[in-house]
């Protein structure tokens, strides 16, 4: 049965119950050989049964490795249990509908550092709230509820403590007024006062909004315990105790343990977890994975977005532009870099001429241009990698479509990189003395622009794969070096071993270099570049057309190379989308 998708906030009150939840990791040592595993699956959780009520905080407590985060993932419908069921008011949940009335706050905060607290809330509210007219009122009310009003215009990169950043994370999860709030170790990394303030605010939210709060916590202080309503004490994936804190001491006495006067009951229970597990005969579970149960839940996990794709792209593009505008130093650096490199290159090759030396210099100048343009975009790699956790959190939560993010990113970088391409082209083209026609200059700008877009897509794709900045930088460096090596600049296609020939056709450098050469020497196709003087006669030895023919090029290939470069641009965007989609799917599974 399916829960009501949009319950009224005033009356919605759900009691969440789990019945014999188990989660296993199958033995995979022989799975690659398609032989059945000889060992039983490894249990992460065994027979977890719990109840969480509205207006209350249920704290999942236990040592590291007890299964707290896995249980939170299951309760947040991010992971499907291998057996057991989750019920709301005694009705089995539908994961798709359940996500609409629940919200999950991960352990690590991730925001755009250049946005203010108010802007961060407003962006999410525009995508989550049905009526745009209530966005401002909702954000103002939420800032007040979280005691963040005085920080509303403070950027997240500066001036916020760990506790305040954690409250921003909680605020983002409250924007659509969920019935359930699930938090993975919200006090992790906070001092005692900040940790207490966070739990106190969560308790206020639970009571004032009639909501259910479930959180995991490693070992809460006595002050925090005074706020928490119920405990679920885990040890090695099994329930040791589930109930109120004031009943824990009686439970320990029943088991034959007396709480020492210097410890509270939870501290003592944490010290004797092994003995408590051994004394409990109900912790041995024989639940086996239910593949059908998991498949059925995955079929139901269809995310329905609240806004149209056009609205998502518009809002995301505005956020991108705002962030780019606030990185004015990076903007200025990119523009100055293009201008200075263009002028330096132009003065080195000034009035290059068209003779034999000019042919060699043009080839070298074009090769350097490609190396500079393709390598200059690597500075965006750390930005993309730092933004990736935010993207995964927002898309896995169903705030917007992943494809909308890719399209908005593309729309923002199109004009930005076009300006950079014009700055570089103007500074280098006329100083060197390349083909003096506006048609050739326009084509040169177009090729430079597409090269920058292609390089940007390439870096974006690698940033979706790389686990960190160091690995990403290594990948970019190695692949760009390989593409340059097989571009035909160092070794011709005819000289390549057959088993490396595929790299010649996969090289981005090859098509960009061909496009620049065709543009230049098509202009000089009938012009003699090298003369042979004999007995007062001059014989033309090399024309522009001969240069192209020697490189295996033809004027008719002018637009073919542009189309291939555009194909690389689209290909790397699609590959980036697929890589991120896999990551998002992994965070939802």
UniProtKB/Swiss-Prot annotation:
Residues at which ATP binds: 62-69
Residues annotated as domain ABC transporter: 16-261
Domain ABC transmembrane type-2: 311-521
GO cellular component, one term: membrane
Parts of the chain that traverse the membrane: 335-355, 365-385, 412-432, 441-461, 470-490, 499-519, 560-580
Family matches, as InterPro entries: AAA+_ATPase, ABC2_TM, ABC_transporter-like_ATP-bd, ABC_transporter-like_CS, ABCG_dom, ABCG_transporters, P-loop_NTPase
Keywords: ATP-binding, Membrane, Nucleotide-binding, Transmembrane, Transmembrane helix, Transport
Molecular-function GO terms, alphabetical: ABC-type transporter activity; ATP binding; ATP hydrolysis activity
Membrane topology: Multi-pass membrane protein
Subcellular location: Membrane
Domain of life: Eukaryota
PANTHER family linked to this entry: ABC TRANSPORTER G FAMILY MEMBER 28, ABC TRANSPORTER G FAMILY MEMBER 8
Family: Belongs to the ABC transporter superfamily. ABCG family. Eye pigment precursor importer (TC 3.A.1.204) subfamily.
Protein name (record): ABC transporter G family member 8
Species this protein is from: Arabidopsis thaliana (Mouse-ear cress)
């Amino acid at each position: 049965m399916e829960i009501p998708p949009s319950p009224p906030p005033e009356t919605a009150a759900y009691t969440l119950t789990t019945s014999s939840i188990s989660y296993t990791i199958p033995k995979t040592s022989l799975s690659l050989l398609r032989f059945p595993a000889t060992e039983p699956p490894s249990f992460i959780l065994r027979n977890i049964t719990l109840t969480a009520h509205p207006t209350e905080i249920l704290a999942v407590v236990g040592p590291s490795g007890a299964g707290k985060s896995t249980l939170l993932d299951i309760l947040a419908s991010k992971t499907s249990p291998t057996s057991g069921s989750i019920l709301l008011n005694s009705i089995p949940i539908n994961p798709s509908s359940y996500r609409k009335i629940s919200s999950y706050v991960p352990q690590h905060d991730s925001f755009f550092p250049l946005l203010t607290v108010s802007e961060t809330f407003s962006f999410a509210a525009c995508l989550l709230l049905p009526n745009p007219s209530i966005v401002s009122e909702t954000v103002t009310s939420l800032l007040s509820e979280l005691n963040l009003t005085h920080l509303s215009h403070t950027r997240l990169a500066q001036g916020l403590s760990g506790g305040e950043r954690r409250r921003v994370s909680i605020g983002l999860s409250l924007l659509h007024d969920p019935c359930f709030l699930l938090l993975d170790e919200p006090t992790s990394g906070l001092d005692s006062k900040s940790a207490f303030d966070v739990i106190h605010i969560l308790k206020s939210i639970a009571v004032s909004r009639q909501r259910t709060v479930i959180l995991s916590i490693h070992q809460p202080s006595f002050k925090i315990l005074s706020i928490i309503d119920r405990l679920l004490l885990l040890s090695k994936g099994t329930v040791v105790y589930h109930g109120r804190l004031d009943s824990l001491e009686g439970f320990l006495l029943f088991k034959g343990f007396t709480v020492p006067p210097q410890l509270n009951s939870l501290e003592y229970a944490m010290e004797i977890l092994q003995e408590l597990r051994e004394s409990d005969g109900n912790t041995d579970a024989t639940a086996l994975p239910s593949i059908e149960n998991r498949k059925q839940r995955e079929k139901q996990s269809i995310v329905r977005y609240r806004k149209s794709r056009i609205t998502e792209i518009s809002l995301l593009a505005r956020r991108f532009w705002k962030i780019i505008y606030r990185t004015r130093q990076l903007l200025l650096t990119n523009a100055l870099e293009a201008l200075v490199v263009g002028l330096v290159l132009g003065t080195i090759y000034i009035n290059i001429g068209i003779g034999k030396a000019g042919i060699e210099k043009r080839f070298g100048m074009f090769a350097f241009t490609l190396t500079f343009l393709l390598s200059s975009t690597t500075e965006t790699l750390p930005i993309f990698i730092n933004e990736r956790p935010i993207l995964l959190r927002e898309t896995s939560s169903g705030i917007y479509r992943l494809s909308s993010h890719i399209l908005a990113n593309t729309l923002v970088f199109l004009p930005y990189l076009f300006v950079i391409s014009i700055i570089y082209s103007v500074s280098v083209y006329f100083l060197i003395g390349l083909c003096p026609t506006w048609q050739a200059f326009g084509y040169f700008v177009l090729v430079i622009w597409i090269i920058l877009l292609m390089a940007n897509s390439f870096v974006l794709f690698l940033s979706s794969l790389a686990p960190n900045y160091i690995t990403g930088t290594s990948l970019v460096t190695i692949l760009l070096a390989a593409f340059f090596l097989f571009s035909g600049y160092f070794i011709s296609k005819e000289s390549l071993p057959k088993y490396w020939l595929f790299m010649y056709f996969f090289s981005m450098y090859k098509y960009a270099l061909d496009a620049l050469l065709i543009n230049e020497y098509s202009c000089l196709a009938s012009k003699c570049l090298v003369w042979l003087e004999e007995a007062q006669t001059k014989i033309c030895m090399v024309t522009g057309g001969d240069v192209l023919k020697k490189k295996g090029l033809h004027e008719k290939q002018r637009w073919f190379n542009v189309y291939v470069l555009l194909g690389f641009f689209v290909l790397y965007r699609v590959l980036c989308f697929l890589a991120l989609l896999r990551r998002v799917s992994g965070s939802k599974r």
